[in-house]
């Protein structure tokens, strides 16, 4: 008997599909850690397959216990619940597991065509999953009715809820069996006061928290994820560097962009449209094997509205660039090339264009696409505002997904993760327009950014690109990029150089005497 047979135990129901065969070894470890504990945190970078882990946890419990069980998958945003349901549905269908599903939020139903395609394919592969309508609503009576139907059919029921609406499930559940498992996606949101109470109101036998970055508070009895009573222990951690070494993320590079005549905040406000266009075009020039697909984090919805009405936007569209914009603002909504579309249509076309190697994209958002949305193909991000640590890591994660062909070749052993010159997408770029005035806040923002990127193996001497540099340059030329930055943006360049000195000193301070001699003098 293998180790995972021991961990996952004897199954109540049998299937000719091993649900764990499709998981990577690190995902199996995370699932095993969750199964061995009733509560805890799984912390892994964006793009490493946390939803697969959630799906496997649910599938394992269904196979072991079968029959009528209640599961809840929570997320901070409505749009993310749609993506989560699709992935969980696909995983369970492939495992030949029939279940009932319901959304608990105000966003309405999703287009079920994609789910039908998944169901039909699973049935062609030997499953026997009948069509069933996906429920949706926040009315307690409707939720309770769905629970009753699942119980009568003796089928597992999986709710996909926003944090805002999750307590309605507990209200509707009264009189039925307890919730078996609660899975909280983007769980760092639960630190916020408006959501934290559901940790206590939504009762379950088992509860897990998934995030790319944990948030702690000064007190280990407060709302932070360092409160073990609320969140349990950290069950599994994968660092960004580990994800890169496994080929599940790409390396970051900073691209400081020089835009003529734009150097301070006032100029920024007057020249935003030019900044976006020039930055995009300079980014395109440094790419050698892929076309640019850039995610822009706007300062506010007004910036997005102004850009969509600008000459620069029209010029980019004439040049073949598709312009996507999304915000909760009704005037923006879900916008593709100036046309309002449904949320589902927006996400469907965005995913399709993200995979299309012949497409150029600019996607502007304000606080919408940062969390967990499955859009691949971004070549870089353009943060036009200072992001919190969690927001930055989530936003960068949107562009850090490897190219599909690169991932396949790494998985098959055709190339390794250090064969950067053989990859279509060896790096994800963080584009910094030259709107810094060199004041203390600007310097602090750059220092904070580089400090966060250290977890990704970022080296300021090697991973900064100037306007006329391309990826794949030699080490000597990489160093010249920092010198170029010092010439064009002296305040920022000197700040980075000084930070590098501090980082090197910190690194050396951690070395033993023998390690230091070897590192410094080769002896």
Q: Model features per residue range: what roles?
A:
Residues 37-58:
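Walker A/P-loop
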Residues 188-249:
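Post-DEXD/H (motif II) to motif III coupling segment of the RecA-like Helicase ATP-binding lobe
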Residues 232-305, 310:
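Conserved interdomain linker/interface between the two RecA-like ATPase lobes of SF2 helicase motors
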């Amino acid at each position: 008997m293998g180790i995972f047979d021991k961990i996952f135990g004897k199954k109540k129901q049998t299937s000719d599909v091993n649900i764990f065969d499709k998981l990577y070894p690190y995902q199996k470890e995370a699932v095993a850690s969750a199964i061995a504990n009733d509560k805890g945190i799984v912390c892994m970078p964006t793009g490493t397959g946390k939803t697969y882990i959630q799906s496997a946890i649910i599938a394992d419990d269904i196979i072991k216990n079968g029959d009528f069980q209640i599961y809840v998958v929570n997320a901070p945003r409505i749009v993310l619940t749609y993506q989560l349901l699709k992935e969980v549905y696909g995983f369970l269908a492939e495992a030949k597991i029939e279940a009932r599903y319901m959304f608990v939020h105000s966003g309405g139903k999703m287009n079920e065509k994609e789910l039908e395609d998944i169901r039909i394919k699973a049935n062609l592969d030997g499953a026997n999953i009948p069509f069933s309508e996906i429920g949706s609503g926040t009315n307690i009576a409707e939720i309770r009715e769905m629970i009753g139907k699942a119980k009568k059919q003796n089928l597992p029921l999986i709710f996909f809820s926003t944090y805002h609406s999750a307590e309605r499930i507990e209200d509707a559940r009264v009189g039925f069996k307890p919730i078996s498992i609660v899975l909280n996606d983007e769980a760092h949101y639960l630190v916020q006061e408006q959501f934290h109470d559901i940790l206590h109101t939504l009762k379950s036998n088992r509860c897990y928290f998934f995030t790319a970055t944990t948030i702690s508070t000064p007190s280990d009895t407060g709302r932070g994820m360092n409160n073990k009573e609320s969140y349990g222990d950290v069950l599994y951690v994968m660092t960004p560097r580990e994800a890169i070494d496994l080929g599940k993320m790409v390396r970051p590079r900073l691209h400081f962009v020089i835009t003529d005549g734009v150097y301070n905040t006032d100029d920024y406000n007057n020249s935003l449209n030019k900044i976006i266009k020039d930055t995009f075009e300079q980014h395109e020039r440094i790419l050698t094997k892929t076309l640019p697909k850039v995610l822009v984090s706007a300062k506010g919805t007004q910036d997005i509205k102004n850009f969509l009405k600008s000459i620069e936007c029209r010029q980019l569209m004439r040049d073949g660039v598709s312009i996507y914009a999304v915000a909760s603002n009704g005037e923006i909504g879900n916008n593709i090339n100036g046309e309002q579309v449904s949320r589902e249509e927006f996400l469907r076309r965005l995913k399709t264009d993200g995979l299309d190697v012949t497409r150029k994209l600019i996607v502007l958002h304000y606080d919408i696409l940062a969390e967990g949305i499955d859009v691949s193909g971004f070549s870089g991000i353009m943060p036009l505002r200072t992001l919190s640590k969690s927001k930055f890591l989530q936003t960068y994660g949107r562009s850090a997904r490897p190219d599909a062909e690169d991932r396949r070749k790494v998985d098959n052993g055709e190339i390794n993760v250090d064969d950067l010159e053989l990859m279509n997408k060896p790096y994800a770029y963080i584009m910094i327009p030259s709107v810094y005035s060199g004041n203390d806040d600007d310097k602090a923002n750059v220092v904070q950014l580089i400090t966060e990127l250290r977890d990704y193996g970022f080296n300021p001497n090697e991973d900064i690109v100037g306007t006329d540099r391309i990826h794949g340059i030699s080490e000597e030329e990489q160093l010249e990029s920092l010198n170029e930055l010092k010439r064009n943006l002296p305040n920022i360049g000197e700040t980075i150089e000084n930070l590098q000195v501090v980082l090197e000193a910190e690194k050396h301070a951690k070395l033993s005497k023998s390690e230091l001699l070897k590192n410094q003098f080769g002896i």
